[in-house]
């Protein structure tokens, strides 16, 4: 069964055409597929496709649907001491996270207040981060401001970020990369998808 392209999930949308909106790497494809583009967290994203929201909802519940979440913030922490540097900013256990695993965490202020939630993963030689769209400038600025010498933050503004959701998600991806069939919850790794190297996680 085909995978349905679906609207971005959560938050609020603004249909004003006067605002200056950023676009994800998949914006042209959304328009080609008939997506109705609206403003969401400063980006032009599809709120629905011609089949309608109900059809999209049911398809996601019964099969699998692909969501463009490229508006979220992606970055990597590199350098010796990267895990310790991030652990100083979150109560989550970063140093104890094994390669190929990811974890949910809270980004905190120096006084211990919660600034945002985020995901982080151990990719072996670097730590991969995903933060919320509406807070990414603040979050990445906060992280960068507290990094010690030798640890650097590298943002990935040009990368797409997709969420494949639904009971058919694993079979759909496993057909393209067989190793994904045995992928465990909160795992992450690099896979070849149609000749493209992709970082894929299950969360």
Predicted stretch roles:
Residues 3-203:
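Basic, glycine/lysine-rich polyanion-binding surfaces/domains
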């Amino acid at each position: 069964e085909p995978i349905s392209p679906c609207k971005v999930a959560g938050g609020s949308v603004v249909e004003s055409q006067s605002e200056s909106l950023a676009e994800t790497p998949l914006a042209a494809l959304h328009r080609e597929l008939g997506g109705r583009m609206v403003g969401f967290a400063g980006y032009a994203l599809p709120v629905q496709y011609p089949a309608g929201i109900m059809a999209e909802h049911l398809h996601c519940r019964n099969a699998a649907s692909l969501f463009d979440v490229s508006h979220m913030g992606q970055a990597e922490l590199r350098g010796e001491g990267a895990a310790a540097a991030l652990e100083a900013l979150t109560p989550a256990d970063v140093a104890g996270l094994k390669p190929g695993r990811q974890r949910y965490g809270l980004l905190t202020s120096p006084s211990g207040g919660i600034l945002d939630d985020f995901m982080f993963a151990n990719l072996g030689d670097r730590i991969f981060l995903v933060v919320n769209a509406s807070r990414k400038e603040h979050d990445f600025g906060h992280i960068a401001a507290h990094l010690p010498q030798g640890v650097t933050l590298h943002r990935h503004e040009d990368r797409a970020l997709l969420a494949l959701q639904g009971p058919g998600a694993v079979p759909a991806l496993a057909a393209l990369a067989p190793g994904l069939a045995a992928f465990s919850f909160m795992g992450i790794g690099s896979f070849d998808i149609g000749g493209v190297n992709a970082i894929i996680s299950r969360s």
